[in-house]
C-alpha cells in the first residue's frame, strides 16, 4: 500500500513515540523529511537525526525531553495533499504568538516562518510545531 502523505506519517510517528516516551523513532527517509528534521533540530525540538545508508534509507530521530516531558507539545500538519496551503510572506502564520514555529517550504528551501519572513519569501506551510 502506498503512503498518501509521508510528512503526516512522520509527524504522527514523532507524536506517538513521544507519548510512549521512546528515545528514538525510525521511518523511511526522504529529502523533505530530512529537511524538516534539520529545521526541528536547529529549533531545538529534537536532539538529533541520522540517515542510515542501507538499500532503503531510514531516518532515525532522537527525541528530546525536558524534566520528563516531551519538548514538542503539539505538532500539526497544515498543508496536505488534498488542500495545499500557500502563504505569502505577509500571510505566514505565527504559532502561539511566536512561541512556536511554522515550517515552510519555499523556493529557497525548507525553513521556519521567521527565516522566511527575514528572507522575504512565502511558500507552502507544511506544519506547525509548539
UniProtKB/Swiss-Prot annotation:
Ordered alphabetically, the record's keywords are: Ribonucleoprotein, Ribosomal protein, RNA-binding, rRNA-binding
A cellular component term from Gene Ontology for this protein is:
ribosome
Subunit and partners: Part of the 30S ribosomal subunit. Contacts proteins S5 and S12.
What the protein does?
Answer: One of the primary rRNA binding proteins, it binds directly to 16S rRNA central domain where it helps coordinate assembly of the platform of the 30S subunit.
- Matches recorded under PANTHER family: 40S RIBOSOMAL PROTEIN S15A
Q: Which family does it belong to?
A: Belongs to the universal ribosomal protein uS8 family.
Do you know which NCBIfam families this protein is assigned to? PRK00136.1
Q: What is this protein called?
A: Small ribosomal subunit protein uS8
> From which organism does this entry originate?
Pseudomonas fluorescens (strain ATCC BAA-477 / NRRL B-23932 / Pf-5)
Q: Which gene encodes it?
A: rpsH
